[in-house]
Structures are given as C-alpha cells and as structure tokens.
C-alpha cells in the first residue's frame, strides 16, 4: 500500500471525528496506518476502505452492514471504553499526538510491555481492529453507501 493513500483514508475518518462530538483517547493515525500495513497486504485496494459502511471512525451509527463494518464498530466501542479509564483522561485534550509502542514481525502485531495503562489499552484496541479487518471480507456494495439513508 502507498503510505499517501492510507493517510487519505485516515484523514477521511479524522474528519468524521470532528463531527461526532465524542471525546476519544489518543490515536496516532499514522501509527494505526502502519499497523494496518503490517497485517493487511493491500496496495491500492486500501483506498476502498474509505467511506465504507456505517462506522468509518468514531461517531458511526446504525446497524453495521457486515463483518468489516462490525470490526469498525467494535473499534469505536473499544475507544469509548478507553475514554473511561482514569489513565486515559489526560490524553483526551490532545487525541492525536500520543503514540504507543508495538512490534510487527512477519505480519504479527504485538503491543509492547513498556506502554502505560492507557497506551496499552489503545494499542490493543487498534491491534484487535487490524486483526479483525484482515479476516473480514470486503463487500463492494458497502462502499460509498450514503450513511444518512443506510445507517439508521
């Protein structure tokens, strides 16, 4: 995958963050993108994850359309749980600047032991999401569906 394409995908999801009014713990989007690249060997096809289903980024709504969309919903819910941790409260004011420590060896992700409680929780949210993405089929009919009419 081309890093610029992944950043475009993540930028779309970030734009949804601003509209959602949901406070979230830290997420380094470039780092999350690198996790995705580690696990999912998607070149240009990664662009197709933009505007997919009802849950691209926090603030999704409605019933997930398929397994991939459920992965995204679960990721949103995991971040909501992280936001309830006392250790994560301090990071809510700067949600995109903090990074966690992780490893990638032969397409296997691990969250490193040197993360504090909040970073470990967030790393595991992202790790679980990426693993879920890698096992979920992509359904072309769920791309660019128009969330207003399909995600109630």
Curated annotation (Swiss-Prot):
The active site is at residues 75, 126. Binds 1 Ca(2+) ion. Residues 20-27 form a propeptide. SUPFAM superfamilies: Phospholipase A2, PLA2. PROSITE patterns: PA2_ASP (PS00119). Ca(2+) binds at residues 55, 57, 59, 76. Pfam families: Phospholip_A2_1 (PF00068). It catalyses: a 1,2-diacyl-sn-glycero-3-phosphocholine + H2O = a 1-acyl-sn-glycero-3-phosphocholine + a fatty acid + H(+). GO terms for molecular function: calcium ion binding; calcium-dependent phospholipase A2 activity; phospholipid binding; signaling receptor binding; toxin activity. Its cofactor is Ca(2+). It is an enzyme of class 3 (hydrolase). One of its GO terms (biological process) is positive regulation of fibroblast proliferation. Snake venom phospholipase A2 (PLA2) that inhibits collagen-induced platelet aggregation. PLA2 catalyzes the calcium-dependent hydrolysis of the 2-acyl groups in 3-sn-phosphoglycerides. Belongs to the phospholipase A2 family. Group I subfamily. D49 sub-subfamily. This is Acidic phospholipase A2 S16-19.
